[in-house]
């Protein structure tokens, strides 16, 4: 059996499940790091290079991984919270034979700045996105309901909008062909309602609506999704299942109904690129392939470095057979804004 980074991530995840205290946390961090290695550990070892060149790998862990590369043992099905994830290395390899997915992408529609829990300024995020050749990005800092992420209230959202307008003027004067869209990641309750005054959303270009509470529910949550899709303030449903690598498997729902409802409502379902989310998964994307629903790609980047997560969503969509025409990030800016304007956010 060939040992991949995904396999190593699972083996480390199992060690975390079995350990306690700081060892549990250390193995958990290592498992997450393995997902994001840009090259297969087996390829590094085959060149007789040190496995310590891989992020998060020290001498002890390098010896353990080397042992697994020699004898991984029997393959075991991952638990639900680690099932259906893919490694960054596999995404890069796949896109290497489908370069048009990178070349035709026009923008990234979910990211965060220092206006909420991001680590970089609006300008830093914009300049980094321009360097990637994007036509546009949407800044989607958290709304006020998510206190842990320093979510914005209506006054802060207005101030951010003024800063975005000034930034766009500055970028244009510097010859950068990038448009920063005014957006927000709005907290949705169990009924699908948002936490912001609708009037404060009217100047925005895009609203991503996301669930951030009651995420460990074991009940069927179809009703919650249908409420969100019926919310006229929402353009994009963010990280739809709310799954997190090694933490929770995601919400349960009738996904056939949800894809159909999204198609009728004209709401895009996000393919969240964060390696710990990868949400929607390839399996769900395949389920929604023929539904007529639209999709949106967002890295959920909280730093300029995390903009590279986009590869995971691109490869997932390509692997699932999603037509690029149904992914709004491949649209020209005028078409994107026309679509967004067709949905009332008031």
Annotated model-derived regions:
Residues 1, 39, 52, 74-105, ...:
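Charged catalytic cores and adjacent phosphate/nucleic-acid-binding surfaces used
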């Amino acid at each position: 059996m060939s040992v991949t980074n995904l396999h190593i991530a699972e083996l480390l995840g199992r060690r975390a499940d079995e350990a306690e205290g700081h060892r549990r946390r250390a193995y958990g961090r290592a498992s997450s790091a393995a997902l994001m290695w840009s090259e297969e550990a087996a390829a590094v070892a085959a060149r007789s290079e040190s496995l310590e060149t891989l992020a998060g790998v020290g001498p002890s862990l390098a010896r353990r991984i080397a042992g697994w590369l020699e004898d991984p043992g029997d393959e075991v099905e991952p638990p639900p919270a680690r099932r259906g994830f893919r490694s960054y290395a596999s995404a890069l390899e796949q896109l290497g034979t489908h370069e048009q997915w990178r070349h035709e992408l026009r923008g990234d529609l979910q990211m965060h700045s220092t206006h909420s829990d991001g680590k970089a300024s609006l300008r830093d995020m914009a300049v980094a996105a321009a360097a990637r050749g994007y036509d546009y990005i949407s800044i989607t800092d958290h709304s006020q309901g998510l206190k842990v992420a320093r979510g914005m209230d209506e006054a802060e959202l207005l101030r951010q909008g003024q800063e975005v307008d000034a930034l766009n003027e500055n970028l244009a004067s510097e010859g950068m062909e990038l448009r920063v869209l005014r957006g927000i990641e709005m907290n949705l309750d169990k009924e699908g309602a948002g936490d912001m005054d609708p009037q404060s959303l009217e100047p925005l270009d895009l609203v991503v609506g996301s669930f951030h509470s009651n995420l460990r529910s074991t009940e069927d949550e179809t009703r919650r999704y249908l409420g969100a899709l019926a919310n006229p303030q929402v353009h994009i449903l963010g990280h739809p299942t709310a799954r997190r690598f090694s933490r929770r498997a995601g919400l349960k729902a009738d996904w056939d109904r949800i894809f159909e409802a999204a198609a009728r409502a004209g709401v895009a379902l996000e393919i969240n690129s964060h390696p710990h989310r990868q949400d929607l998964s390839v399996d769900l994307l395949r389920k929604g392939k023929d539904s007529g629903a639209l999709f949106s790609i967002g890295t959920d980047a909280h730093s300029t470095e995390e903009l590279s997560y986009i590869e995971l969503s691109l490869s997932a969509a390509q692997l699932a057979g999603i037509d690029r025409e149904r992914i709004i990030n491949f649209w020209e800016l005028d078409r994107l804004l026309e679509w967004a304007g067709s949905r009332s956010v008031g």
